[in-house]
């Protein structure tokens, strides 16, 4: 790993620990999906930043593109993945390459896939055959941004990077790739990972606001496949072998310690060069899949993993599972970390999110952010509920619920989230 990345990661940890308050999670329409709750040996793999029309590096696959090598390997093991594709980085200039082995290896101001001055070999815009192959073989394709420009500032590691100027620019960029996939392939991309997983944006917006608008879920991962990290070995072959080991051994050790370790997990992979312009994933993916197969795992796209359970803390053994799943499809009941926290008391803000129409909630929050540059997570829903007499004018979003509107709920004297969701009249959906 380059020293810049090491320093950036350590600095971020220190800031989070000493300065940044603990992250708060709120009920919303978009949640960050890193894993799901299941006892079955089923998991998912995501492949960021492709498709890549250049060969693997080093090329020991007769000139086949890296993406073809990955698809061949997945097919060999009966596995299918989620490919987080970009559109085209050809407009990301003027720019220059940074130091090899650093986070800026492919561009100081922008990302370039698969490499700087090779943009015409990357992305969905230039790789029609690869996109069609992904779809024909049952893989999922998700929206990783048309130009793969980060949504906001990221001072650690990417301090010199250009970022999108705000909410509208992010929506425009995602819509461009969304439309390309719809018009060219008749394919709709519901989940999405933001470029470099940057969430905070200018004007008080976040990636969650953008995905609310797009109707996406935020797709992330719980286990790093590690193919993007460069080895510090000076000899190229020794470096490649070290990178392959760094991808395979953590998975092997995790499975030896706990054979159920990967149940419901999402494993992050790279469909492109690492920071040293090598592609260890081309060599290590087969070893990883062989390990998972040895332990009886099925590897599926994230969309199919979500069919197992859409939640991180609730599975099919929960008596309310079907009700909760139906509610989550039309109402905001899940926290941003994809947890339900069923046995905690419900707050007034969470009740407002359950009752208010999605369009009203999102529109009001966006309008408030445009107007004054700040808005609470529940402000849009609270405003609608107050106007419709469902919560009192004096109620604060953090107050615990002590009564429920009779037209919306069957009688209950308990106000945990579990009991409130159980009492909700489903004919109000």
Identify what each model region corresponds to.
Residues 42, 65-69, 126-129, 165, ...:
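Extracytoplasmic/secreted proteins, especially bacterial periplasmic and envelope-associated proteins
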Residues 119, 123-127, 133, 146-268, ...:
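Catalytic domains of cell-wall/extracellular-matrix polysaccharide-remodeling enzymes
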Residues 3, 8-143, 147-153, 157-158, ...:
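Active-site beta->alpha N-cap acidic-glycine motif
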Residues 75-79, 135-136, 175, 179-186, ...:
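Sec-exported extracytoplasmic/periplasmic mature domains
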Residues 92-94, 149-155, 227-230, 360-363, ...:
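Short acidic/His/Gly/Ser-rich catalytic and metal-binding motifs that mark active-site loops
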Residues 306-321, 329-417, 426-429:
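Feature responds to low-complexity, polar/acidic, surface-exposed segments characteristic
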Residues 94-97, 154-157, 230-238, 311, ...:
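Short secondary-structure transition/capping segments
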Residues 50-61, 154-168, 274-278, 311-314, ...:
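Second-shell loop/turn segments in exported
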């Amino acid at each position: 790993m380059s020293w810049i990345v090491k320093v950036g990661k350590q600095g971020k940890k220190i800031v989070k620990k000493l300065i940044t308050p603990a992250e708060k999670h709120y009920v919303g329409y978009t949640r960050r999906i890193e894993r799901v709750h299941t006892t079955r040996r089923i998991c998912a793999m995501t492949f960021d930043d492709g498709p890549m029309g250049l060969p693997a590096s080093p090329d020991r696959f007769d000139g086949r593109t890296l993406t073809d090598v990955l698809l061949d390997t997945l097919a060999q093991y009966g596995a299918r993945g989620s490919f987080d594709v970009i559109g085209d980085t050809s407009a990301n200039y003027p720019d220059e390459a940074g130091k090899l082995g650093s986070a800026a290896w492919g561009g100081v101001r922008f990302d370039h896939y698969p490499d700087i001055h090779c943009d015409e070999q990357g992305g969905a815009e230039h790789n029609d055959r690869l996109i069609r192959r992904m779809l024909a073989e049952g893989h999922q394709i998700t929206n990783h941004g048309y130009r793969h420009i980060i949504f906001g500032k990221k001072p650690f590691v990417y301090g010199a990077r250009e970022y999108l100027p705000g909410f509208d620019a992010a929506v425009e960029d995602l819509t461009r790739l969304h439309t390309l996939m719809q018009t060219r392939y008749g394919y709709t991309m519901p989940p999405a990972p933001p470029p470099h997983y940057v969430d905070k944006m200018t004007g008080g917006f976040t990636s969650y606001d953008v995905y609310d608008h797009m109707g996406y879920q935020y797709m992330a991962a719980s286990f790093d496949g590690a193919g993007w990290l460069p080895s510090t070995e000076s000899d190229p072959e020794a470096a490649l072998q070290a990178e392959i080991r760094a991808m395979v051994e953590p998975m092997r050790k995790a499975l030896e310690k706990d054979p159920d370790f990967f149940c419901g997990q999402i494993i992050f992979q790279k469909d492109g060069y690492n920071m040293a312009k090598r592609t260890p994933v081309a060599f290590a993916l087969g070893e990883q899949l062989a390990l998972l197969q040895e332990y009886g795992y099925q590897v599926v796209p994230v969309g199919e993993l979500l069919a197992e359970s859409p939640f991180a803390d609730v599975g099919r053994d929960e008596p309310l599972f079907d009700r909760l799943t139906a509610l989550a499809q039309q109402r905001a009941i899940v926290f941003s970390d994809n947890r339900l926290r069923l046995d905690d008391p419900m707050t007034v803000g969470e009740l407002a999110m359950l009752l208010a129409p999605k369009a009203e909630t999102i529109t009001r929050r966006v309008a408030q952010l445009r107007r004054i540059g700040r808005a609470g997570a529940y402000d849009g829903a609270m405003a609608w509920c107050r106007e419709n007499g469902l919560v009192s004018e004096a109620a604060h979003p953090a107050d615990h619920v002590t009564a429920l509107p009779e037209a919306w709920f069957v009688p209950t004297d308990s106000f945990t989230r579990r009991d409130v969701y159980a009492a909700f009249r489903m004919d109000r959906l």
